[in-house]
């Protein structure tokens, strides 16, 4: 069962998503991956941030109310 993140709510904030990524990587004992992931998340627009997040955590989370133009590859 995956968690649903409403991207139009406070959990859809880019800073919240980066903090969530940090938290989950810590819980998975993979904190060393965060700096590279954060750099990749910040290297483009909001849709890029969402794609990077989904690539890493797609088995844990689903997005609700994704912005127009966002497509999860």
Predicted segments with their positions:
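Long, contiguous binding/interaction regions
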Residues: 1-73
